[in-house]
Amino acid sequence: MKNNVVVVTGVPGVGSTTVMQKAMDKLIEEKISYKMVNFGSMMFEVAKEEGLAEERDQMRKLNPETQKRIQKMAGRKIAELSKHSPVAVDTHSTVKTPKGYLPGLPAWVLNELNPDMVIVVETDGDEILMRRMGDESRNRDLETTKSIEEHQFMNRCAAMAYGVLTGATVKIVKNKNGLVDNAVEELISVLR
């Protein structure tokens, strides 16, 4: 297997987790196995253990220093996993906070993970807005299509910066409404 660490990113509601899970399921049928790790879940485990958050979406509102410390601890845990098997990390390129965009993979996390590839899952802002409005399982801040598109632009910028710093390739995968299988096939084609 040529990829030891692959990072799959996207704004909340774009469907990056769904695309990644479906791709992993199909790759297993081909005897290609990645360990799936959700960076936010790893961070939430740390935050919950420290009594800093009771639900995952509260982490966005923690002060930046606390978020950075939690990121570093989660990055170390994932780096340990990648020493034993290829890892696909489900995360966000950037996290929108009240004080601005926080890099999802700052230098101290990138240095640990050293990804081979960064994948950015995207679609139109209005599609994401509609998906978010229909998802009652999450406590998300309401945003406009324009602010979602700005967030996707910031994700692209961050992904390229991650590539510059690590030598990772950057791939954009489109996840249009009703065409998730196309996005899955596009992701699989670069993970083989």
UniProtKB/Swiss-Prot annotation:
One Pfam assignment: AAA_17
Keyword Transport among UniProt keywords: no
Membership in a protein family: Belongs to the archaeal adenylate kinase family.
EC annotation from Swiss-Prot or TrEMBL: 2.7.4.3
Record localization: Cytoplasm
GO CC annotation terms, alphabetical: cytoplasm
Binding site for ATP: G10, V11, P12, G13, V14, G15, S16, T17, T18
UniProt main location, coarse: cytoplasm
Enzyme class per UniProt: transferase
Protein name per its UniProtKB record: Adenylate kinase
Keyword set, alphabetical order: ATP-binding, Cytoplasm, Kinase, Nucleotide-binding, Transferase
Species per Swiss-Prot/TrEMBL record: Methanococcus vannielii (strain ATCC 35089 / DSM 1224 / JCM 13029 / OCM 148 / SB)
Residues annotated as signal peptide: none
Record NCBIfam families: PRK04040.1
Subunit structure, interactors included: Monomer.
GO terms of molecular function: adenylate kinase activity; ATP binding
Keyword Kinase: yes
Source organism superkingdom: Archaea
Catalytic activity: AMP + ATP = 2 ADP
